[in-house]
Swiss-Prot record:
Residue numbers of N-acetylalanine PTMs: 2
Phenotype of null mutants: Defective activation of the ribosome quality control (RQC) pathway.
Annotated GO CC locations: cytoplasm; cytosol; cytosolic small ribosomal subunit; nucleus
Phosphothreonine PTM sites in chain numbering: 96, 168
UniProt-recorded name of the protein: Small ribosomal subunit protein RACK1
Function: Component of the ribosome, a large ribonucleoprotein complex responsible for the synthesis of proteins in the cell. The small ribosomal subunit (SSU) binds messenger RNAs (mRNAs) and translates the encoded message by selecting cognate aminoacyl-transfer RNA (tRNA) molecules. The large subunit (LSU) contains the ribosomal catalytic site termed the peptidyl transferase center (PTC), which catalyzes the formation of peptide bonds, thereby polymerizing the amino acids delivered by tRNAs into a polypeptide chain.
Amino acid sequence: MASNEVLVLRGTLEGHNGWVTSLATSAGQPNLLLSASRDKTLISWKLTGDDQKFGVPVRSFKGHSHIVQDCTLTADGAYALSASWDKTLRLWDVATGETYQRFVGHKSDVMSVDIDKKASMIISGSRDKTIKVWTIKGQCLATLLGHNDWVSQVRVVPNEKADDDSVTIISAGNDKMVKAWNLNQFQIEADFIGHNSNINTLTASPDGTLIASAGKDGEIMLWNLAAKKAMYTLSAQDEVFSLAFSPNRYWLAAATATGIKVFSLDPQYLVDDLRPEFAGYSKAAEPHAVSLAWSADGQTLFAGYTDNVIRVWQVMTAN
């Protein structure tokens, strides 16, 4: 891992009329980026890598009647899922932008969505304090109770073991708790206790061994999933809105209220602190990133901002 690597701002993607709340990429379609926004839409982008325009919008996904808070893609990039404050989820055909399925059952804003690698189970987390498990056809298989405040994020833990069919998911909430659940039995596996404030975001490492979680107090906690215990804490020094593990380096990116911090985890150091220039804003009112996604090859970091713009960084070797 070269310690002289830095991230360079390569371009922007503009098309949303509200905060860019979520971003998704897929290994199956490396030139596809999906974004979700407070403008109630999602946009699929074709990534060109051009210096003038890093990508172009392909289509807008319309149907939600309120803010779209989260989105994800199936591994092959053929289908998209979205979670909205209109209390529903949607499954979309990426090629056409048509809604394939609606998921109705949550009693409040749906904050988060994810899907397992076999595309057989969809999970959602809501301000109604529940996590729901769905089939791809929209049937609710289970409602998981355990959080006693808003569920802010849910994620499927990557499982690379070919002979292991178990599905573990993780969740975080405003109750300051991180939880792990076994989806084969729909049971809670572990509580991870240590945060002192609302948790906005959590994510699992690509090999499924680590969880990172963070929120209002700026403390990023790293957890060992198998041992069910805390490992160490990184200080982001500002509220954290999104976390993303690099797919091919021991890096963790954190979108904070003042910039995007990219941490190396082994050895531990700050790789970069991404703070683009914002013309025409006072320091206090500067936009900040609220969503992150790495490209599947780990060379590009996408960030969605509160000025409705997606900014694109590429990993470069510093001379």
